[in-house]
Design a protein with these regions (language model features):
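Residue-level marker for the onset of beta-strands and adjacent loop->beta junctions
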Residues: 112-114, 201, 309-311, 382, ...
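Outer-envelope beta-barrel architecture signal
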Residues: 123-125, 168, 212, 229-233, ...
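Surface-exposed extracellular loop regions of Gram-negative outer-membrane beta-barrel proteins
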Residues: 274-324, 413-469, 539-546, 635-639, ...
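Structural preference for beta-rich elements and adjacent junctions enriched in aromatics
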Residues: 22-421, 427-429, 440, 804
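Catalytic-domain carbohydrate-binding cleft regions of carbohydrate-active enzymes
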Residues: 300-304, 322, 329-562, 567, ...
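Exposed, low-structure sequence patches enriched in small/polar residues
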Residues: 379, 465-810
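Bacterial N-terminal signal peptides
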Residues: 2-16
């Protein structure tokens, strides 16, 4: 049949509403009236079946701490995933009940009943979920994109800690219609859940008059687990009711402990788990036609269509080690980065990784600081990755050849990470990175880190690293980094203190370190009061933080800090998913005269520019943010701030040159027109007015619109429009208003810059499962000579692309 035959067959089966190539069965209910069309069908019949079998099933009540579940084994279940839970095979499943709320009120019985059936077969683990609801009209359910419903829909989340190590767990999340969300829970990471990895599994859900029901089937070959004849897995099930923000779990949770996974239940005595030797082959075919503006002639022209072939491969070396490889990868379906305001930024901006190959196994590379930043591999020709866990040691290695276009040649990148378990929840790790460009330059970093959990409540993070950067036959530049932080987990009194020291010579070219040559000390204390169950104010409280930055030599010489910030914040959350916070801070900056070397006033006799130090003392700022998580058909977030801020002379190394009053605001609004159609509107604006005379130094305005229509779980169309207008003026002396010159070989003024860009993107996508896709997309880059001069826009570049890939699991 061939590659395209398989692709078309899969598309036909999915559109017909039956099991496709991957065996997925979806409810045949799509479009604007999805929820309404399935009301009244399912939950009543499911509850009748439950009543008749309750005496036969083994029930494990989480509220009674019945958290150890012996293997609920069934060899050959005949279960068709349709969200009904009416097959007799479910009678053999263990039943998880007795959910308790952990947010906003901890320890009380859940407001709505949840019952989860668990089955383990020779090929998969299955979950049958009955989420009862006394207000079925209040159930939030949309045909959202994968991983995209966490802030809009009700959901049930299953955590599987397959190594039972309390450090990492698979996350499988479903909304009432069976739409999938998946990722990896990483204890101690900044985001807690990494939603980027996608796994192959099946799900189906239905809404009825008493709530909703969902069936899930997770193949064992989609999981990594120990190579052991008998093993235990950590198990947790959570449920969120979106209309009120109530969250409950099967195994009771408390915020008084540092580790969430350590509070999970357990699937005990799992035997005969044989995933088989996993082999995924994922060929990719792309075609594109690109256009651009010729810088010499000013004419716009398009090139002839071109095509390309790439290949992705995943091979299960063992049940716990995986090899991933890619050749000529294509990331054309990846959404472009949202525009960021850059008119007064001192440091490089961080952009999250979005490319599929680099997302798998990224949890192993999580560290207190980003010594591994895979976006530093800009355009790989090919790459390979090994990741997994052997005993109590997690390992990961990425090797890549980057097509950088640099004059020093294409760099070869190697990233190695090893992390070992210590005790119940602690870890120690090592990282090594090497970026070598054809023998012309090199950068190497060696580091170690530890996360130590003390008395179940306190977490100590420590990290030390050294770097070597240079070229052959030249002196190597050495650098060091050290940090330590201590935090206290609590639902009421929270504490955190940290220390970080980075030498000026530290370079991590495969990582992302925002500042070097500094020493930072900061501390934070906060207290939270919580209302009774059902109270109007669910939680509220203040927090106080203090930060100080020193030039590294000045810190060790006992001198005053270069920058300080004292901040007092107040936050509150109200019934119905409404919240906000208010922050008042006071900043000070002290820069020695030597940092202003090379800056002069533009006068007949150029004189050195040395602003008065007191200009940058006691600058204040006031920030306000509020949000409504989901209110009927909308979700909204608002923010505003008014502050005094330095104007930084970027050519002078980021030194403050003037003071401005900064006015900023942003709004993000998501509208749920139907269960299939959503629209997002965002607007960000920042204006800096010179404090001396109120004249404008800079302004930036970025409106963004996105619309998405989900025809089915697999088929969607998306459109994005974003306009970015940013202007920056020249640096002026804060007293006289004289222009400031930057002089090295010659003297030049920073007379400002401006950009007014418009970006349009359109994408039609068909993605029945991760790796099997058809994308047809178009993008256009335009600009205009004046702000919002939409009648004067000219096209700078455009591109039309088609991508097709199929994931063969052998």
């Amino acid at each position: 049949m061939g590659f395209y035959g398989f692709l078309l067959l899969g598309a036909g089966l999915q559109v017909a509403g039956v099991s496709g190539v991957h065996g997925e069965a979806y409810p045949d209910t799509t479009g604007a009236d999805t929820v309404a069309s399935i009301q009244g069908e399912v939950v009543a019949s499911a509850s009748r079946v439950t009543a008749s079998r309750a005496a036969e099933a083994s029930v494990y009540d989480g509220s009674l701490r019945e958290l150890v579940v012996p293997q609920p084994r069934l060899e050959e279940p005949s279960i068709r995933l349709d969200g009904r839970l009416d097959e007799e095979a479910w009678e053999a499943g263990a039943v998880l009940s007795g959910f308790t709320q952990y947010d906003p009120t901890e320890g009380i019985a859940a407001t709505q009943e949840t019952r989860v059936r668990v089955l383990v077969t020779s090929e998969a683990i299955l979950f049958g979920i009955q989420a009862f609801d006394g207000d079925p009209d209040g159930v939030r359910a949309t045909l959202a994109q994968r991983d995209g419903f966490g802030r809009s829909d009700d959901y049930v989340r299953v955590l599987l800690d397959t190594f039972n190590d309390n450090r990492r767990a698979y996350v499988f999340q479903v909304n009432p219609l069976g739409v999938q969300g998946d990722g990896v829970w990483v204890e101690g990471s900044r985001r807690e859940i990494d939603w980027n990895p996608d796994f192959l599994w099946e799900s189906a859900g239905r809404v009825g008059p008493r709530g909703y029901s969902v069936e899930m089937k997770i193949p064992l070959n989609s999981l990594r687990f120990p190579d052991a004849p008998v093993q235990d897995w950590g198990l947790q099930v959570m449920r969120r009711i979106q209309r009120n923000g109530f969250e409950a779990s099967w195994a009771p949770l408390t915020g008084e402990r540092a580790s969430t996974l350590a509070q999970s239940g357990r699937l005990q005595g799992l035997e005969g788990l044989e995933p088989g030797r996993l082999l995924d082959v994922n060929p990719v075919v792309t075609a594109r036609r690109q256009g651009g503006l010729d810088s010499e002639t000013g004419r716009f022209s398009r090139s002839s269509p071109t095509g390309d072939v790439g290949m992705n491969l995943t091979y299960g070396l063992t049940s716990n080690l995986t090899l991933d490889a890619t050749y000529n990868p294509d990331f054309s379906q990846v959404e472009a980065d949202a525009g960021q305001i850059t008119v007064n930024e001192r440091f490089a901006l961080y952009f999250p990784e979005k490319r599929p190959f680099f997302l798998e196994g990224t949890d192993i590379f999580s560290m207190p600081r980003n010594l591994v930043y895979t976006r530093s591999i800009a355009n790989p020709v090919g790459a390979a990755k090994v990741s997994g866990k052997v005993g109590g040691v997690s390992v990961a290695h990425i090797g890549a050849l980057d097509r950088s276009g640099s004059a020093t040649g294409d760099p070869v990148v190697n990233l190695l990470r090893v992390k070992g378990d210590v005790g119940g929840s602690s870890t120690v790790g090592m990282v090594y990175t090497d970026r070598t460009a054809s023998g012309e330059s090199f950068n190497r970093v060696l580091g170690s880190d530890a996360r130590i959990v003390l008395a179940r409540r306190y977490t100590l993070d420590v990290m030390a690293a050294a770097s070597a950067d240079g070229r052959p036959e030249e002196d190597t530049r050495w650098g060091s980094l050290f940090l330590a932080s201590l935090s206290r987990a609590s639902r009421s009194l929270s504490l955190r203190a940290s220390f970080e020291d980075v030498s000026r010579g530290f370079r991590a070219r495969s990582g992302f370190i925002r500042r070097v040559g500094t020493t930072q000390v900061d501390g934070r204390v906060g207290y939270t009061w919580r209302g009774e169950a059902g109270a109007l104010v669910e939680r509220w409280g203040p927090s106080l933080s203090l930060e100080g930055y020193w030039e590294r030599p000045a810190f060790w010489d006992g001198k005053a800090p270069r920058e300080t910030e004292l901040s007092l914040s107040f936050s509150a959350s109200f019934r119905g998913n409404v919240g906000g916070y208010l922050s008042l801070s006071r900043d000070s900056y002290t820069f020695p005269a030597a940092d202003y070397e090379g800056l002069f006033l533009d006068s007949p006799e150029p004189t050195p520019f040395r602003p008065q130090a007191q200009l940058f003392q006691g600058l204040w700022s006031l920030r306000l943010r509020s949000w409504i998580s989901r209110w009927e058909g909308a979700r909204i977030s608002l923010g505003a701030s008014l502050s005094e801020t330095p104007i930084f002379h970027r050519a002078g190394g980021g030194v403050p040159a003037d003071v401005a009053e900064r006015l900023s605001g942003d709004v993000d609004l998501t509208l749920y027109f139907t269960s299939s159609f959503t629209g997002e509107m965002g607007l960000r604006h920042v204006t800096l007015l010179r404090k001396r005379d109120g004249s404008r130094y800079s302004s930036a305005t970025i409106p963004r619109l996105e619309a998405r229509y989900q025809f089915s779980r697999a088929l969607f169309v998306r459109g994005i429009g974003e306009y970015s207008s940013q202007r920056r003026g020249g640096i002026l002396d804060p007293v006289s208003g004289t222009p400031v010159l930057s002089c090295d070989e010659d003297c030049r003024s920073s007379d400002g810059s401006s950009s007014h860009d418009l970006r349009l993107e359109g994408l039609v996508g068909y993605e029945p499962s991760p790796g099997t896709v058809v994308y047809l997309g178009y993008s256009r880059q335009m600009d205009s000579p004046t702000a919002f001069g939409l009648g004067e826009v000219r096209t700078r570049a455009d591109g039309l692309f088609l991508k097709m890939s199929y994931r063969f699991r052998l």
